[in-house]
Curated annotation (Swiss-Prot):
Belongs to the class-I aminoacyl-tRNA synthetase family. Keywords: Aminoacyl-tRNA synthetase, ATP-binding, Cytoplasm, Ligase, Nucleotide-binding, Protein biosynthesis. It comes from the Bacteria. It comes from Escherichia fergusonii (strain ATCC 35469 / DSM 13698 / CCUG 18766 / IAM 14443 / JCM 21226 / LMG 7866 / NBRC 102419 / NCTC 12128 / CDC 0568-73). NCBIfam families: argS. Gene3D superfamilies: Arginyl tRNA synthetase N-terminal domain, HUPs, Isoleucyl-tRNA Synthetase, Domain 1. This is Arginine--tRNA ligase. Its EC number is 6.1.1.19. One of its GO terms (cellular component) is cytoplasm.
Length: 577
C-alpha cells in the first residue's frame, strides 16, 4: 500500500478541478511533525503563482473538490496554503489487517523492469580491501530491494580482470610454478602481486618477458589464457569467501569482467570513426566532447585508442553500456562506483548517447558514494598506514562482537554465541555504512557501530528480539490472531500504524534513488515508535482481550516489517539476544 501515491493522485485531481494545469505537482510528503497530520500537500505555492492567485485561496478551492472519505478523518489548511491530512483510524486499521495477510506486507508490485546493477568490482590477483566495502554492500542493498519489489535484476560484478599487468602476473606465476610454489604464492594474493611488481621494476629481462606475455595473452594464445584463468579463479574463490561472510548475494555467476568486452572494442572504435564521432589526433583515436571543456576552454578530447593500438577504460565502459542494453536488454542501469569516477563515466556515457548505443529512455545512473574515513578524518588505513584488508576488518568485527555478546550473555552456549556474534559483528559494519547518506564521506568508528543505542545494527537487532519477546510472553501463535480485528483508538497506536504503512513508500525511495540510509532511518524511527507504543499502550495487561489481540497484531506487523526491512539491507536478525 502506497498511501503517498494514493493521496498524491486524489490531491492532483482536486487541483485540476480547481483550475490547475493537468501536469501540476501536488507535492504530498510525510509530515515532519505530528501536529501537521500524517501527510502534507505543499504544491499550492508553485501552482497558485502560475494561476495568479493566493496559495491559501487555491488550497480552499482544492478542499471543496478533495474527497478523502474513508481515508482521512480531518483535512485542514495551514499557514500560507499547506494542506494537512490526518489519516482515519479505521483506514489505518483496515490496512494493517491487509498487510498482515500477505508475505509482502501489502507491498504492491510495480511494473517489472530489467535492471542491471554494477557493483563491487574488485581486481584480480589482489585481495579485497575496505575500499571495496561501500560499493559491495550499498549495491547489494539496492539489488535486494529491487528484487523484492519484483524487478528482474542482473548483478554485474565488473571485475578488473584485464590489462597490461597480466603479463607481469603470468610471468611471475610461471616462475613460481617452476619452483613448485605457484599455489602457495597465490594463497597470499597481496604478496604475490607485490613480488611480481618488484621483479618487473628491478629485472629488465623479466619485464621484457612480461611485455611479450601481454601480447600473447591478448592474441588469444591458449597457454596464456589458461594461466590467466587460473589467476581469475583463485582470486574469485577468495572473494566469494568474503561475499559469503558479508551476507552479500553476489556469486561467481555474476562476474562480468573487463575481459568480456574485449572482442567488442575494435568494432566500437571503427564504428565511432565511421559515425564521424572519433578522429585521429597525434596518432591516437579521440572523441572530442563539447559538453566537457579543457583548461583552454576547448572541447575535451577523450582517447578511446592509444597510438600503440591499446584501448582505455573509457573504451571498455562504452562497450559495457552497449552490451547491457543490446544483449542484457536493460531498462535501467545502476553503477555503484565511487564519486572520483564521475567525470570519467559521464564522458563515456556522452559518447554512448551520441553513438546511439543506448537510447535516452534507458537511464544510466551513477549512484556514487563518498569515502570511508578513520577517526582522524583521513582515508581509513592500518596503524602502519597501509590498506586495510576486508577480511581483516571482518575478523576484527567478529572478535569485538564476540567479546560484547559474551559479556552480556556469559552462560550462552558456544555455538549460539558464535552465531550471534557473527550477526552482530558483520551487521554492525554493514549498517554503520548503509545508515549514512552514500554521497558523503563517513567516519568508521568501532565504538559507535557496536553500541546498543542509537541508529546501529545491534540496537535494531535488539529492537526486533524485543518485539518477539512480547509474543513469547503472550504464549499465542500468529495463526490464533488471524480473525482478531485491529482497533485503533489511542494516538500512539495510530502513529505506529501509520508508520508501518509507510514501508512501501520507503522501499520505493530506496529503489528509485539507491539510498539505503532512507530504509535505516525508517526502521530506526519505527523501532522508536514501537518503544513508545509499548510503554504507553499495555499489551499483555490490556483492559480486555480485544484490545490485547489488536495490539499484538500491531506488534506482529512491527516485527515482520523490521525483519523484512533489515533483510533488504542484508542485515541478519536473530530470535534472542
Amino acid at each position: 500500500m502506497n498511501i503517498q501515491a494514493l493521496l498524491s493522485e486524489k490531491v492532483r485531481q482536486a487541483m485540476i478541478a480547481a483550475g490547475a494545469p493537468a501536469d501540476c505537482e501536488p507535492q504530498v510528503r510525510q509530515s515532519a511533525k505530528v501536529q501537521f497530520g500524517d501527510y502534507q500537500a505543499n504544491g499550492m505555492m508553485a501552482v497558485a503563482k502560475k494561476l495568479g492567485m493566493a496559495p491559501r485561496q487555491l488550497a480552499e478551492q482544492v478542499l471543496t473538490h478533495l474527497d478523502l472519505n474513508g481515508i482521512a478523518s480531518k483535512v485542514e489548511i495551514a499557514g500560507p496554503g499547506f494542506i494537512n491530512i490526518f489519516l482515519d483510524p479505521t483506514f489505518l486499521a483496515e490496512n494493517v489487517q491487509q498487510a498482515l495477510k500477505s508475505d509482502r506486507l501489502g507491498v504492491a508490485t510495480p511494473e517489472k523492469q530489467t535492471i542491471v546493477v554494477d557493483y563491487s568490482a574488485p581486481n584480480v590477483a589482489k585481495e579485497m580491501h575496505v575500499g571495496h566495502l561501500r560499493s559491495t554492500i550499498i549495491g547489494d542493498a539496492a539489488v535486494r530491494t529491487l528484487e523484492f519489489l519484483g524487478h528482474k535484476v542482473i548483478r554485474a560484478n565488473h571485475v578488473g580482470d584485464w590489462g597490461t599487468q597480466f603479463g607481469m602476473l603470468i610471468a611471475w606465476l610461471e616462475k613460481q610454478q617452476q619452483e613448485n610454489a605457484g599455489e602457495m604464492a597465490l594463497a597470499d594474493l597481496e604478496g604475490f602481486y607485490r613480488d611480481a611488481k618488484k621483479h618487473y621494476d628491478e629485472d629488465e629481462e623479466f619485464a621484457e618477458r612480461a611485455r611479450n606475455y601481454v601480447v600473447k595473452l591478448q592474441s588469444g594464445d591458449e597457454y596464456f589464457r589458461e594461466m590467466w584463468r587460473k589467476l581469475v579463479d583463485i582470486t574469485m574463490t577468495q572473494n566469494q569467501i568474503t561475499y559469503d561472510r558479508l551476507n552479500v548475494t553476489l556469486t561467481r555467476d555474476d562476474v562480468m569482467g573487463e575481459s568480456l568486452y574485449n572482442p567488442m572494442l575494435p568494432g566500437i572504435v571503427a564504428d565511432l570513426k565511421a559515425k564521424g564521432l572519433a578522429v585521429e589526433s597525434e596518432g591516437a583515436t579521440v572523441v572530442f566532447l563539447d559538453e566537457f571543456k579543457n583548461k583552454e576552454g576547448d572541447p575535451m578530447g577523450v582517447i578511446i585508442q592509444k597510438k600503440d593500438g591499446g584501448y582505455l577504460y573509457t573504451t571498455t565502459d562504452i562497450a559495457c553500456a552497449k552490451y547491457r542494453y543490446e544483449t542484457l536488454h536493460a531498462d535501467r542501469v545502476l553503477y555503484y562506483i565511487d564519486s572520483r569516477q564521475h567525470q570519467h563515466l559521464m564522458q563515456a556515457w556522452a559518447i554512448v548517447r551520441k553513438a546511439g548505443y543506448v537510447p535516452e529512455s534507458v537511464p544510466l545512473e551513477h549512484h556514487m558514494f563518498g569515502m570511508m574515513l578513520g577517526k582522524d578524518g583521513k582515508p581509513f588505513k592500518t596503524r602502519a598506514g597501509g590498506t586495510v584488508k576486508l577480511a581483516d576488518l571482518l575478523d576484527e568485527a567478529l572478535e569485538r562482537a564476540r567479546r560484547l555478546v559474551a559479556e552480556k550473555n556469559p552462560d550462552m552456549p558456544a555455538d549460539e554465541l558464535e552465531k550471534l556474534a557473527n550477526a552482530v559483528g558483520i551487521g554492525a559494519v554493514k549498517y554503520a555504512d548503509l545508515s549514512k547518506n552514500r554521497t558523503t564521506d563517513y567516519v568508521f568508528d568501532w565504538d559507535n557501530m557496536l553500541a546498543f543505542e542509537g541508529n546501529t545494527a545491534p540496537y535494531m537487532q535488539y529492537a526486533y528480539t524485543r518485539v518477539l519477546s512480547v509474543f513469547r510472553k503472550a504464549e499465542i501463535a500468529e495463526e490464533e490472531l488471524a480473525a482478531a480485528p485491529v482497533i485503533i483508538r489511542e494516538d500512539r497506536e495510530a502513529q505506529l500504524a501509520a508508520r508501518l504503512l509507510q514501508f512501501e513508500e520507503t522501499l520505493t525511495v530506496v529503489a528509485r534513488e539507491g539510498t539505503p540510509h532512507v530504509m535505516c532511518a525508517y526502521l530506526y524511527d519505527l523501532a522508536g515508535l514501537f518503544s513508545s507504543f509499548y510503554e504507553h499502550c499495555p499489551i499483555l495487561s490490556a483492559e480486555n482481550e480485544e484490545v490485547r489481540n489488536s495490539r499484538l497484531k500491531l506488534a506482529l506487523l512491527t516485527a515482520k516489517t523490521l525483519k523484512l526491512g533489515l533483510d533488504t539491507l542484508g542485515i541478519e536478525t536473530v530470535e534472542r539476544m
